[in-house]
């Protein structure tokens, strides 16, 4: 994912973008700021403050959506199903990175945030209904 992010950062340097990497890997690259010990607040703030998010993390994918950020998500093998299912459930297939060798991904995709909010509300109502049915079943 770094290659994709680095290429996008380089292409968008005129916009003053920098690349922040949160994870365990060290990059010897002046254009990449690394953060190895990001706690929950740092992680969420990085996404909230970002103009764009490039991730292979399920949670970063979800929070990019919650915070209404333009993003691209690469589904790695260990979490890939969750990421792909999430993108499908929210009609966000355009935000999917399929090939890490490509560096021409764009953040020009049109995301219908009203539709996303509607889907979130429907899923929330379905979850509440399920929880209530379980709680009432125990009475």
Tell me the role of every PLM-derived stretch.
Residues 4-5, 15, 67, 90:
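Short, structured coil segments at secondary-structure junctions
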Residues 19-20, 71, 94:
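Hydrophobic beta-strand scaffold residues
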Residues 24-25, 29-56, 61:
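Donor nucleotide-activated moiety binding/catalytic core segment of transferases
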Residues 46-86:
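A donor-sugar binding/catalytic signature common to diverse glycosyltransferases
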